[in-house]
A protein has these predicted regions:
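ATP-binding/phosphotransfer module of carbohydrate and carboxylate kinases, centering on a glycine-rich
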Residues: 1-61, 66-71, 76-112, 117-137, ...
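Short glycine-aspartate micro-motif
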Residues: 76, 86-90, 146-150, 214-218, ...
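Short, acidic, Ser/Thr-enriched surface-loop or helix-capping motifs
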Residues: 102-103, 159, 228
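Residue-level signal for well-ordered, solvent-exposed loop/turn and beta-edge residues enriched
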Residues: 106-107, 163, 232
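Glycine/GP-enriched mid-protein hinge/lid loop-to-helix segment characteristic of carbohydrate kinases
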Residues: 110-112, 120-124, 182-322
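Glycine-rich phosphate-binding loop and adjoining helix at the ATP-binding site
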Residues: 110-213, 362-373
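Short glycine-rich anion-binding loops that position phosphate/pyrophosphate groups of nucleotides
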Residues: 154-156, 221-222, 357-358
Length: 416
């Protein structure tokens, strides 16, 4: 028996996928322009687009005057981003965010629950699915309107199996997150490391649309990173890759939650900074901080430091006590040094930084100064702050589902 040829059905779905990716990248286009970009006949593209309109995947969106042809207008088509909805879940050590979005990453509704680490992971995940169902009910959405659920979690994740291998600060053992959630929700579930998921969000919705090889660095509450090579997330052996938070910066240093000693996180995570500031704390050495906390150093928490970072130019970081500035400058220098070392090894086209610490203008400016001190080529043209930072709690989970079950799938009909 001869080798089977390429299925015409697969060709159709591949072409649909290419159309969706093109519209996602360029916005509304005419059938004629799509045909030119894809190298297909206008008739073939018209058939594809008409089928996608019938499936409610794309919609016609007005007209555009053709150049050089008076009176002739192009009818534009664009993605119907509301044809299905996505639930994005971001599990962090303290809180878990649940957000309903459309395929474009538009936020419809969200809720926040405490990440209960006292309960078993399975019981917590059952509670999570109940909250998801409540949120969907409040939005009058049925399960069949859901494209899938994207779950982002810190630490090491086996995406293929939907398993959290080690969620630092949340669960120490393996948890079959995908299996538990999909059993209760009866829909596709993708589980991924939070930084890798955010990188997918950037590739689909942000600066990553224009670059093939990139490095992503997150600071706050811990330190995370992800590598994109050839527009694909790089995954190393045993699902480890670019764990710069666990780069050794202090031999025989403080024990890290990963089990090693002297990791970058032990010096610069927000929890580590809170402990170091407590050690510096006194009315004489830190008068402003002393006044701010009413003489109670136990008020120096991860939440307080995060609030300082989020306030911006008017916050405490802009007018720190000298002793506090010493601590913060040391942390920023370490972050910059490790970032420069990683950029030197990987030589990405761009580095995108995000997270509450690097969103703060004062901290980011200092970070860039240290980067340029080590290498003058590391300017704002090479290192960018993410424009999606305000969507950090959901854009990664949305991208996981949208990319896999919509853009790579030629829409929704193949799965259904």
């Amino acid at each position: 028996m001869g080798k089977p040829g390429i299925s015409l059905e697969n060709v159709k779905y591949n072409n649909k996928s290419e159309i969706l990716k093109m519209l996602q990248k360029n916005g509304a286009m005419s059938r004629k322009d799509i045909a030119v970009h894809m190298g297909l006949t206008p008739a073939a593209v018209t058939l594809l687009c008409n089928a996608m309109i019938e499936e409610n995947i794309i919609v016609e969106k007005g007209e555009l005057q053709e150049e050089k042809r008076a009176g002739r207008r192009k009818v534009l088509v664009d993605i119907n981003y509301d044809c299905k909805y996505i639930v994005s879940v971001s599990i962090e050590a303290v809180d878990t965010w649940i957000t309903v979005t459309n395929i474009k990453g538009g936020d419809l509704a969200s809720t926040k629950i405490a990440t209960d680490t006292i309960k078993s992971p399975e019981d917590f995940l059952k509670d999570l699915t109940k909250e998801i169902k409540i949120l969907l009910w409040e939005q009058e959405l049925q399960l069949n309107e859901l494209l899938g659920i994207g779950i982002c979690i810190p630490g090491i994740v086996n995406r293929k199996k939907g398993i959290s291998i080690h969620a630092y600060g949340i669960w120490d053992d393996e948890v079959e997150v995908g299996k538990v959630v999909s059993e209760y929700m009866q829909c596709p579930v993708i589980v991924e490391n939070n930084v890798k998921a955010f990188a997918e969000g950037e590739m689909l919705y942000g600066a990553g649309k224009s670059g093939d090889n990139m490095l992503f660095i997150k600071w706050g509450p811990g330190v995370g990173s992800a590598i994109v090579i050839g527009n694909e997330l790089y995954e190393g052996y045993q699902h480890n890759a670019a764990e710069i938070g666990h780069y050794i910066v202090e031999p025989n240093g403080i024990k890290c939650r990963c089990g090693r000693h002297g990791c970058l996180e032990t010096r610069v995570s927000i929890s580590a900074l809170a402990e170091r500031l407590k050690n510096e704390y006194s009315e004489e050495r830190t008068p402003q901080l002393y006044k701010l906390t009413n003489g109670d150093k136990e008020k120096i928490t991860r939440q307080l430091i995060t609030e300082w970072a989020e306030v911006g130019e008017e916050g405490y970081f802009a007018q720190m006590d000298p002793a506090v500035e010493n601590v913060m400058s040391g942390a920023v220098e370490r972050m910059a040094r490790v970032a420069v070392n990683v950029m030197t090894i990987l030589a990405p086209e761009h580095t995108i930084v995000f997270g509450p610490m690097l969103e703060n203008t004062h901290i980011y400016k200092l970070f860039m100064e240290y980067c340029r001190e080590y290498d003058e080529h590391y300017t704002d043209e090479y290192i960018h702050r993410s424009k999606l930072s305000k969507k950090i709690s959901y854009i990664g989970g949305t991208a996981l589902i949208a990319r896999t079950y919509f853009f790579e799938n030629g829409g929704i009909s193949k799965k259904e």
